[in-house]
Amino acid sequence: MPELPEVETTRRKIEPLLRGKTIERIVHDAPHRYRNTERAHGRQVRGLTRRGKYLLLHLAAADAAEDEPHDLELIVHLGMTGGFRLEEGPHTRVTFELGSGEKLYFNDPRRFGKVVAVAPGDYASMPTLAAMGPEPLSDDFTEAEFVALAARCGPVKPWLLSQKPVSGVGNIYADESLWHARLHPAQTRLNADEAGRLYRAIREVMAAAVDKGGSSLGNGVGNYRQHDGEGGGFQHSHHVYGRAGQPCDRCGTPIEKIVLGQRGTHFCPVCQPLRTDRSA
């Protein structure tokens, strides 16, 4: 699933293609998954922002003054395999027809992606978006608050994946951050030192992943690529994710893979020992 670095890279790549353009029509094949998109017809794209793993297209009437705020948001969630392309393909689910005559295609082989038009800030229909925590690279994500929350957390990796303590961290970047912080993925109730290490690791890993355009894990049709076919580069910096059985880059112990919270989870059993409460 595309996580924050992949979605942020997508935003940066497609914003120049859409900003200032009018959406003439949105054509799709599943009204239950792509909801209220007709509300975007005839509206101009003012800009694109991102919240966690969600893209938000800011739309306004085509004749609205430049200083008028946008009055509609088109929320795009890439799901497991969604992404934008410049050419239609067998997995195209949504077509954005622009007033310029150009088209942008949303491809999604596994059909978990969503496109929903809402009033600005009206995220009641998307509870994960409405309740998610601060952006990991923003000033709103503070070490003091994170340490306080982590002191009473359950198993730390599922806690991160809930999006409540911090937004945009998924399977890949949770595993990588926990390796950098030397924390077992099932560790509970982090002490201040552990939580501080994890806080700093999240910021460092996410910044590096954004800088390298995210992670591309293969060449299959569902693997992450940008609209121009370019992949990410952070997969070459993975220390644990996808490396089960390979030696840890820090100590040489084979990386293990377990299932935790129904998610495949990679860690080093030596560098990331599970602490007992007695050793807190």
From Swiss-Prot:
Keywords: DNA damage, DNA repair, DNA-binding, Glycosidase, Hydrolase, Lyase, Metal-binding, Multifunctional enzyme, Zinc, Zinc-finger
One Pfam family, short name: zf-FPG_IleRS
Enzyme Commission number(s): 3.2.2.23, 4.2.99.18
Binding site for DNA: H91, R110, R152
NCBIfam families, alphabetized: fpg, PRK01103.1, PRK14811.1
Similarity comment: family membership: Belongs to the FPG family.
Cofactor note: Binds 1 zinc ion per subunit.
Organism for this UniProt entry: Deinococcus radiodurans (strain ATCC 13939 / DSM 20539 / JCM 16871 / CCUG 27074 / LMG 4051 / NBRC 15346 / NCIMB 9279 / VKM B-1422 / R1)
Function summary: Involved in base excision repair of DNA damaged by oxidation or by mutagenic agents. Acts as a DNA glycosylase that recognizes and removes damaged bases. Has a preference for oxidized purines, such as 7,8-dihydro-8-oxoguanine (8-oxoG). Has AP (apurinic/apyrimidinic) lyase activity and introduces nicks in the DNA strand. Cleaves the DNA backbone by beta-delta elimination to generate a single-strand break at the site of the removed base with both 3'- and 5'-phosphates.
Catalysed reactions listed for this entry: Hydrolysis of DNA containing ring-opened 7-methylguanine residues, releasing 2,6-diamino-4-hydroxy-5-(N-methyl)formamidopyrimidine; 2'-deoxyribonucleotide-(2'-deoxyribose 5'-phosphate)-2'-deoxyribonucleotide-DNA = a 3'-end 2'-deoxyribonucleotide-(2,3-dehydro-2,3-deoxyribose 5'-phosphate)-DNA + a 5'-end 5'-phospho-2'-deoxyribonucleoside-DNA + H(+)
Name under which the protein is recorded: Formamidopyrimidine-DNA glycosylase
Disulfide bonds: none
Quaternary context: Monomer.
Biological processes annotated in GO: base-excision repair
Zinc finger motifs (FPG-type), residue ranges: 239-273
Active-site residues per Swiss-Prot or TrEMBL entry: P2 (schiff-base intermediate with dna), E3 (proton donor), K53 (proton donor), R263 (proton donor)
A GO molecular-function annotation: class I DNA-(apurinic or apyrimidinic site) endonuclease activity
Cofactor: Zn(2+)
